[in-house]
């Protein structure tokens, strides 16, 4: 029995005639899909995990039941749904085709997108960076050779502005894969750790994070193994950082236990892949005979650089593959290629494990040659060239007005809590950096991730009250490993060259790992940590552990781990080894420039505040902002209002500021008004008649001011024409200065006229004196 052909969600049963019916684009039978859907219809399963003062709720079986695996993870009122789907037919690609997408919906925050179409368009930086964190947390646990298209989608259902959704998405991906039949050696658990007043806080709220000196995301595997680390910190001490990692790993184990309990209750059975793309042992054995000695000779020839070494290895590859094709004509091309890769990787790693030597002749803890240079181009606000081995990075600093900072719209602020940002680092990796040809298009995920890491490394040392927006660009000119950490070093040098008063210099380094694993237990038997890794060491190694900071502490960390998990001990040793190397790099950088320049360069931008009296503001701005627009167009300055009488003028160069200052002085100049005497009577010329009064000028180049109807005559009038006033007529007015509240000129014609009949009353006299009339005799006698 199986479900109706026409509707997979209904529960009517009817026999299928000719075998199982398959959905379009799917290669599994509908009968298999129905078992999962019918089971889900009986109700969802859920588990709650206590994390200190927080509770993590994990559920499955209610939403997205056609997916191979789905889960909803909730903390407070923030909820994320994650689905996992994997094809059952292999992909033609020769790698693990895993796609992770994290999407934020404006509806989750109760908002409507602010773009023209009022719908989600494109992908934000936050979505890309979160997708990368999720990918790095789950990718190492897929079986080797599992080349099947797999997609993990994370959909933000609701966000309360209190609990962050990114950690929930990592846990949701773990649950979805664990509850699916997709081969995956999970689960993993993830938590965020903050340090507030010296205490570690698990999954802190958004408000708590604003006062935290650490933002650490830890993804852990069973047996207290670490799979992924991502952190930004306010230059915290190494021991505090290590303690936070240990606390994070402890709480990840509680999440893992909750997921394992849910998997046990569900009774998940993993599918058996058609094929795992691993080379035949026989072909690998023959490759050993053909290439091992030649590869050993290349990897122990310390005269090679990146280019010559790659050429030598490729020559051996071509010769070996040709002989393997003759020996094994029936073998798949992938087996031939991968057999050589396996042997090359084994030879490379054994040299490090057994001989404690690296392919460029360094020992395990040595740095490559480091050289620095600043003030590369005089016209730039700041520039630096950082060279480490064959990795070369050019960094520049540009200043602009505060108005040029990144502005977050209301939706992004509601979802992520991200507000305006006046410091940014942009990383570029052109194809020529590795002697390749490629499209030079928009930003890709890798460039965004590397730039975000370098920005995290530098942000803590940037002064918060700096009067400019700072943009650091990092262009990789040559790449042979650890270009993101070279960007942090080069960015620090460029900032000091530009005169930004950073609190301390920043340096970064990458630590690699080579392990030897027990084939039966799957545990690490032996390992070597490598300081300042090359590109080939990153490719053939098990970890890329990037850490940046000052002489005092740590500002950023990112760990890309290729193993299904590493012990805490290795992570602690890597941090210690990186700290030693970081201080050594800082000593070299200090020889080039040890502290920020005391002043910015002569061609750098300047900011000045201008006082514009309220009386001159209308003239300064001009009708419809004409004068301001003209000023900005002609001089290139940016003007923003600070308060009612103060304007901030940003000029890209001092000469532009002088030009703008002259322009402003000319606009606001009014020498004749300074000669006006308070209480004096002047002749005014009527220039315009309005319903509310007349516009008059006291002198020719004066801006006409309004003489209100109430100040035209002692009598109450509704229109100036009632007094016979005309345009061009001259009248006498008295000058009373300017109103301190709104800056308007105060004039009056009424006070110059004889007083109208009024009654003056006194508190002592019961009688009244009528002004303008003769006093009667009776009244005089009574007095």
From Swiss-Prot:
The gene is PNPT1. The lineage of its organism: Eukaryota, Metazoa, Chordata, Craniata, Vertebrata. It holds the Pfam family KH_1. InterPro entries: ExoRNase_PH_dom1, ExoRNase_PH_dom2, ExoRNase_PH_dom2_sf, KH_dom, KH_dom_type_1, KH_dom_type_1_sf, NA-bd_OB-fold, PNPase. Homotrimer; in free form. Homooligomer. Component of the mitochondrial degradosome (mtEXO) complex which is a heteropentamer containing 2 copies of SUPV3L1 and 3 copies of PNPT1. As part of the mitochondrial degradosome complex, interacts with GRSF1 in an RNA-dependent manner; the interaction enhances the activity of the complex. Interacts with TCL1A; the interaction has no effect on PNPT1 exonuclease activity. This is Polyribonucleotide nucleotidyltransferase 1, mitochondrial. Residues 605-664 form the KH domain. The modification N6-acetyllysine is found at residues 250, 264, 285, 289. Residues 1-46 form a transit peptide.
């Amino acid at each position: 029995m199986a479900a109706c052909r026409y509707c997979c969600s209904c529960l009517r049963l009817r026999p299928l005639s000719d075998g199982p019916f398959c959905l379009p684009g799917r290669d599994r039978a509908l009968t298999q899909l129905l078992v999962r859907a019918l089971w889900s219809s009986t109700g969802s399963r859920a588990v709650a995990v206590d994390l200190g003062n927080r509770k993590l709720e994990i559920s499955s079986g209610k939403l997205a039941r056609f997916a191979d695996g789905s889960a909803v993870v909730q903390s407070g009122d923030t909820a994320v749904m994650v689905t996992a789907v994997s094809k059952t037919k292999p992909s033609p690609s020769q790698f693990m085709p895993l796609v992770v997408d994290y999407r934020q919906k404006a509806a989750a925050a109760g908002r409507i997108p602010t773009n023209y179409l009022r719908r989600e368009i494109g992908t934000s930086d936050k979505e890309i960076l979160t997708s990368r964190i999720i990918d790095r947390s789950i990718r190492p646990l897929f079986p080797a050779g599992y080349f099947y298209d797999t997609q993990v989608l994370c959909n933000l259902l609701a966000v309360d502005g209190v609990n962050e959704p990114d950690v929930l998405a990592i846990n949701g991906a773990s649950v979805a894969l664990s509850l699916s039949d997709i081969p995956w050696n999970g689960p993993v658990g993830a938590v965020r750790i903050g340090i507030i007043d010296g205490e570690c806080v698990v999954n802190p709220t958004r408000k708590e994070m604003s006062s935290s000196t650490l933002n650490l995301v830890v993804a852990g595997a069973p047996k207290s193994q670490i799979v992924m680390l991502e952190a930004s910190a306010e230059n915290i001490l190494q021991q505090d950082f290590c303690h936070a990692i240990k606390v994070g790993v402890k709480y990840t184990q509680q999440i893992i236990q909750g997921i394992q309990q849910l998997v046990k209750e569900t009774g998940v059975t993993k599918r058996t892949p058609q094929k795992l793309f691993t080379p035949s042992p026989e072909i690998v054995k023959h490759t050993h005979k053909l290439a091992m000695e030649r590869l050993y000779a290349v990897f122990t020839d310390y005269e090679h650089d990146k280019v010559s070494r790659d050429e030598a290895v490729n020559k051996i590859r071509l010769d070996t593959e040709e002989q393997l094709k003759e020996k094994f004509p029936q073998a798949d091309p992938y087996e031939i290629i991968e057999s050589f890769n396996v042997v090359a990787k084994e030879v490379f790693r054994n040299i490090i494990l057994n001989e404690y030597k690296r392919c460029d002749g360094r020992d395990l803890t040595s740095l490559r040659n480091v050289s620095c240079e600043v003030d590369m181009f005089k016209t730039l606000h700041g520039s630096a060239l950082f060279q480490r081995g064959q990795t070369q990075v050019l960094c520049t600093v540009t200043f602009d007005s505060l108005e040029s900072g990144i502005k977050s719209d209301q939706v992004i602020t509601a979802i992520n809590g991200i507000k305006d940002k006046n410091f940014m680092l942009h990383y570029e990796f052109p194809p020529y950096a590795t002697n390749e040809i490629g499209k030079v298009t928009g930003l890709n995920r890798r460039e965004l991730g590397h730039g975000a890491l370098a920005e995290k490394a530098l942000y803590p040392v940037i002064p918060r009250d700096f009067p400019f927006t700072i943009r650091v660009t990092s262009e990789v000119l040559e790449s042979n490993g650890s270009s993101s950490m070279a960007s942090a070093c080069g960015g620090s040098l460029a900032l000091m060259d530009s005169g930004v008063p950073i609190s301390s210099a920043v340096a970064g380094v990458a630590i690699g790992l080579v392990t030897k694993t027990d084939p039966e237990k799957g545990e690490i038997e032996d390992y070597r940590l490598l300081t300042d890794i090359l590109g080939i060491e990153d490719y053939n190694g098990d970890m890329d552990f990037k850490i940046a900071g000052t002489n005092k502490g740590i500002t950023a960390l990112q760990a890309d781990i290729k193993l299904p998990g590493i012990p805490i001990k290795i992570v602690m040793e890597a941090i210690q080894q990186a700290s030693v190397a970081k201080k050594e790099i800082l000593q070299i950088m200090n020889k080039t420039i040890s502290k920020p320049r005391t002043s910015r360069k002569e061609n750098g931008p300047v900011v000045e505040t201008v006082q514009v009296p309220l009386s001159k503001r209308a003239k300064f701005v001009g009708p419809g902002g004409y004068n301001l627009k003209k000023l900005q167009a002609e001089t290139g300055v940016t003007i923003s209002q600070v308060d009612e009488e103060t304007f901030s003028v940003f000029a890209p160069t001092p000469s532009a500021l002088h030009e703008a200052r002259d322009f402003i002085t000319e606009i606001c100049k009014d020498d004749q008004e300074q000669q006006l005497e308070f209480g004096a009577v002047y002749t005014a010329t009527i220039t315009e008649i309005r319903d509310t009064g007349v516009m008059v000028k006291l002198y020719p180049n004066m801006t006409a001011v309004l003489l209100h109807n109430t100040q035209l005559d002692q009598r109450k009038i509704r229109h100036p024409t009632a007094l016979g006033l005309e345009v061009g007529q001259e009248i006498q007015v008295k000058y009373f200065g300017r109103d301190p509240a709104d800056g308007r000129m105060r004039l009056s014609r009424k006070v110059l006229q004889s007083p109208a009949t009024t009654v003056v009353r006194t508190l002592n006299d019961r009688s009244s004196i009528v002004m303008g009339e003769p006093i009667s005799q009776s009244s005089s006698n009574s007095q």
